[in-house]
């Protein structure tokens, strides 16, 4: 396993966080309309992945549906077909799959994928989302990079897709913001101890902390 350099396209272009969303215009974060808008503007795109109940990577930030839809409860208790019928609040869009997002982007702009922590504790990963992501990216023609707050996910992706650049999403890990994560664990992750172990090539850090 080797460290893979981040393509220049990720540094030349602005990267739209959760795509180019604008709620007043009906473009909700991580939605097809937000993805199309970012591509049209020539901007790179960052999206988040959660796993459906039937093992499909879904482009959605939260682990629960409540904030962005009229539904409630965990994303991972619904199938991809069920999630694909749930409308995003304030939009005509529904929750897209990774495959649908890739088809919209079609290699025209760089894509940064954050794999959301499925353990919810920054603990070991069962590897299901990582495996589904690697499979979904197989054969995709375009610049892609992967990242996660959870170093276990980054390490897993390094084994499954060693050809793709990977990074660690980091934070100040204020215990008040990361409860119930214990303070010693916050201090551990604050030091970014897994950067070299995962052969990461970049860090994505929360802007307010810089």
Where are the regions that the model predicts?
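Phosphate-group recognition and catalysis centered on beta-loop-alpha active-site segments
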Residues: 1-210
């Amino acid at each position: 396993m080797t460290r893979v350099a981040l393509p220049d396209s990720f540094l030349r272009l602005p990267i739209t966080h959760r795509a180019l969303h604008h709620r007043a215009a009906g473009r909700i974060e991580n939605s097809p309309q937000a993805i199309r808008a970012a591509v049209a503007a020539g901007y790179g795109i960052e999206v988040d992945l959660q796993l459906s109940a039937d093992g499909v990577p879904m482009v959605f930030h939260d682990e629960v549906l409540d904030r962005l839809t009229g539904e409630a409860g965990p994303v991972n208790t619904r199938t991809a077909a069920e999630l694909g019928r749930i409308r995003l609040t304030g939009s005509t869009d529904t929750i897209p799959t990774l495959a649908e997002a890739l088809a919209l982007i079609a290699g025209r702009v760089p894509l940064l994928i954050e794999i959301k922590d499925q353990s919810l504790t920054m603990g070991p990963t069962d590897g299901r989302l990582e495996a589904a992501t690697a499979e979904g990216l197989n054969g995709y023609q375009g610049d892609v990079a992967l990242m996660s707050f959870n170093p276990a996910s980054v390490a897993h992706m390094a084994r499954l897709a060693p050809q793709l650049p990977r990074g660690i999403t980091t934070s100040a890990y204020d215990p008040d913001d990361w409860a119930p994560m214990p303070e010693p664990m916050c201090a551990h992750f604050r030091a970014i101890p897994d950067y070299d172990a995962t052969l990461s090539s970049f860090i994505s850090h929360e802007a307010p902390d810089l």
